Design a protein with these regions (language model features):
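Signature of extracytoplasmic/envelope-associated structural regions
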Residues: 1-320
């Protein structure tokens, strides 16, 4: 008996498109974005029945609500990361200067009062199956800087509806030109001063989504997803050289972080203008050098940028 072929990850794709109306998949505007992995899925529990019928046989189970959610790991590329930043923070303020081939576009992403929704498609063209998730919003976004690993971002999403289609939602979707940023070309400022003693820095955004929105008539799917208050946290790991960083944590002194990635003429800058470190003293783990790890939380209080996070992407793409 012949063995049927199965879908290959190497031939699969993730395509995204921003929705004009929440939960409605567009037919144009699709972008095929590079990924490391994607595990978005719709899951539905089979719940046990508690019905008693006079014998010991179980009654048939019943189906629960459908949870559309999952995670993607994506590379941090000069062009493609802008789409995920837009999904998380909304339309950036963009400004283009110069003419090709010297054109530069600056895109500034801040925390706003609204949040876009998108359709995400996991496509398996070798078996003609296309999972299309509509009404999707980014629930969490995380970055890990430092070391010699490939620079990636984690994107957690929550969605409303899954459709299993035989064709892609946008046959004209374009693949993004991929040029990666690298940890090798990162610089960091702590408290406004460029430093070379920080080994790693994690920055995590939680967008506070409310997914408890299973309305009657929704056939088990969410009908809407409300964005909530954003929380920003992270951790820096630094050489323990003196008391400066530890004193900031002990005294609750406000500080800031600014991390920049550069690739050729293009940059990606993360700025947290106002943050405080959590008190966490170092210890002696052995004969090697001592490091200090300080968790932090960022917020907005009085900074002129009026946002707890300001992310600036400079590339040659005019709009997102």
């Amino acid at each position: 008996m012949a063995t049927a072929k199965r879908a290959q990850g190497s031939q699969s794709h993730v395509a995204i498109a921003f929705e004009a109306d929440f939960g409605t998949t567009p037919s144009t505007g699709g972008v095929i974005t590079p990924i490391i992995s994607s595990s978005v899925k719709a899951s539905q529990n089979l719940n046990d029945s508690t019905v008693i019928r006079g014998d010991r046989n179980p009654a048939a189970p019943f189906r629960g609500n459908i949870d559309t959610s999952g995670s993607l790991t994506v590379p941090v590329g000069v062009i493609d990361i802008g789409y995920w930043l837009k999904a998380a923070f909304g339309q950036p303020t963009s400004n283009t200067t110069g003419q090709a081939p010297n054109k530069k576009s600056e895109h500034v992403f801040k925390i706003g009062n609204t949040m876009p929704s998108l359709t995400i498609e996991q496509g398996y063209p070798d078996v003609n199956v296309f999972q299309q998730f509509a009404g999707v919003r980014v629930s969490k976004l995380g970055f890990k800087f430092g070391g010699d690993s490939e620079l990636t971002a984690s994107v957690d999403v929550m969605g409303c509806k899954e459709t299993l289609a035989a064709t892609t939602f946008d046959a004209a979707a374009k693949a993004v030109n991929f040029l990666p940023f690298q940890n090798l070309n990162a610089t960091i400022k702590e408290g406004g001063v460029t430093v070379a003693n920080i080994l790693s820095c994690d920055i995590n955004f939680d967008f506070g989504l409310d997914g408890d929105s299973y309305a009657i008539g929704g056939k088990g799917f969410r009908t809407y997803i409300d964005p909530g208050i954003v929380s920003i946290s992270g951790t820096i790991k630094a050489f323990f050289q003196n008391k400066d960083l530890l004193n900031k944590a002990v005294n609750g002194t406000e500080s800031s972080l600014e991390l920049q990635l550069a690739q050729d003429d293009w940059t990606l800058t993360f700025k947290l203008p106002e943050l405080v470190y959590e008190r966490q003293s170092p210890g002696i783990d052995g004969p090697r050098g001592v490091n200090i790890e300080l968790p932090f939380k960022a917020y907005y209080r009085a900074d002129a940028g009026r946002s707890a996070s300001i992310i600036t992407l400079v590339n040659n793409q005019e709009q997102y």
